[in-house]
Structures are given as C-alpha cells and as structure tokens.
C-alpha cells in the first residue's frame, strides 16, 4: 500500500480555514495509533483547563496565542507562544489555550492509554476570595478518543448550567466564558 502524500499546510488552510470553528476550533489532520495532529484556529471560546495524561506539542503557525497553565507549584502561569514558536507541554499539566482571532496553530497529542482519562476543569476566577490559588469549581472526566467531537458537548453543558458554575467555596458564579486572570 503506498504512503499518503505530504500535506501542503498553507494550501490546506487556504481551502479549509472555515472548519476551525469555536468553541474549540480544531480539525484533525492526521490520526495514527500513537498520535493525533490537529490544526487549531482562533478565536476560541473556552474557559476550561484541559488535563491530559500525555504531553502536548504546540506550534504556532499564524499569529500569537496564550497558553494559561497551572504550574508545578500549583499557581496560575501564562505562557505566550508567538508566531513561529514551538512549545512542549508536560503531561498532567492543566492548561487553557487562548487563541485570538485570525490565528492558527498545529497541536500534536499522543493517543491516550486505556484507563487514563482526560479531564476538563473550571477554576473560580474570584481572586479576592482565593488569591493566586486555583480553586476547582467543576471537573468532568472522559476517556479521550476524539477531541473534535468530545470537548464541545462538555463545554456546552458548562455554558448552559449557571448553577453548576457557582464556586462552593466563595459562592461566586463564574461567567460561561470567564477565565481566571
């Protein structure tokens, strides 16, 4: 069986950029037994932090993005990734990719081992109550097989559940798209 031809990404993007739609904005370019390669466009419309058991590789092809993470010390940290830059996110790092309008990146993820679920997490943005300490409001676990189809219903459920966005520690009700600063 012959190998598939290489993908001309600039050409693909010029013909398919309309496929990169919120809330996540991703489109699977390649999927193998071990890896998934996605094009991801902005703007996205997410307020979650994604937790996964594997590393994640970011290459920012067009424009800049901001990767919000919770670092090893349990503190919020912003990592700007500029056009042309690459970044390898360590496994088990909660992260929230903030993609701006007219931006495109490539993301490479490992296939998740069976029994190693991903999680979507939302943290309270009320700094008056919590300072810089991430305070979990909600967490949803799932066995990731296809981010393109699995994230949207989880995000939509968050958006449509105002009572579920209330912090049990301070009572603050988070906006549907509100991220901790």
From Swiss-Prot:
EC number: 1.13.11.6
Keywords linked to the UniProt accession: Cytoplasm, Dioxygenase, Iron, Metal-binding, Oxidoreductase, Pyridine nucleotide biosynthesis
Compartments reported by the entry: Cytoplasm
Catalytic activity: 3-hydroxyanthranilate + O2 = (2Z,4Z)-2-amino-3-carboxymuconate 6-semialdehyde
GO molecular function ontology, one term from the record: ferrous iron binding
Membrane-traversing stretches: none
Domain of life (superkingdom): Eukaryota
Cofactor (UniProt): Fe(2+)
Residues given in the record as Fe cation binding sites: 50, 56, 95
GO (cellular component) term, any one: cytoplasm
Pathway participation: Cofactor biosynthesis; NAD(+) biosynthesis; quinolinate from L-kynurenine: step 3/3
Binding site residues for O2: 46
Chief location: cytoplasm
Entry binding sites for substrate: 56, 99, 109
Cited CDD domains: cupin_HAO
Gene Ontology biological process terms from the UniProt entry: 'de novo' NAD biosynthetic process from L-tryptophan; anthranilate metabolic process; L-tryptophan catabolic process; quinolinate biosynthetic process; quinolinate metabolic process
Uppermost EC category: oxidoreductase
Similarity annotation: Belongs to the 3-HAO family.
Function: Catalyzes the oxidative ring opening of 3-hydroxyanthranilate to 2-amino-3-carboxymuconate semialdehyde, which spontaneously cyclizes to quinolinate.
Protein name, entry field: 3-hydroxyanthranilate 3,4-dioxygenase
Species the sequence originates in: Mycosarcoma maydis
Record lineage: Eukaryota, Fungi, Dikarya, Basidiomycota, Ustilaginomycotina
Gene name for this UniProt entry: BNA1
């Amino acid at each position: 069986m012959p190998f598939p031809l290489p993908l001309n990404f600039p050409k693909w993007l010029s013909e398919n950029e309309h496929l990169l739609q919120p809330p996540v904005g991703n489109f699977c370019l390649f999927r193998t037994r071990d890896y998934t390669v996605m094009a991801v466009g902005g703007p996205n419309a997410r307020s979650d932090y994604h937790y996964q058991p594997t590393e994640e590789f970011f290459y920012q092809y067009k424009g800049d993005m901001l990767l919000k993470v919770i670092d090893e010390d349990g503190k919020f940290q912003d990592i700007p990734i500029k056009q042309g830059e690459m970044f390898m996110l360590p496994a088990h790092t909660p992260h929230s990719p903030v993609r701006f309008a007219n931006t495109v990146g490539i993301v490479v993820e490992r296939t998740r081992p069976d029994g190693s679920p991903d999680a979507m997490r939302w943290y309270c943005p009320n700094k008056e109550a919590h300072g810089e300490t991430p305070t979990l409001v909600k967490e949803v676990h799932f066995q990731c097989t296809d981010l393109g189809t699995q994230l949207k219903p989880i995000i939509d459920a968050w958006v449509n559940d105002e009572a579920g966005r209330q912090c049990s520690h301070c009572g603050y009700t988070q906006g549907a798209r509100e991220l901790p600063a």
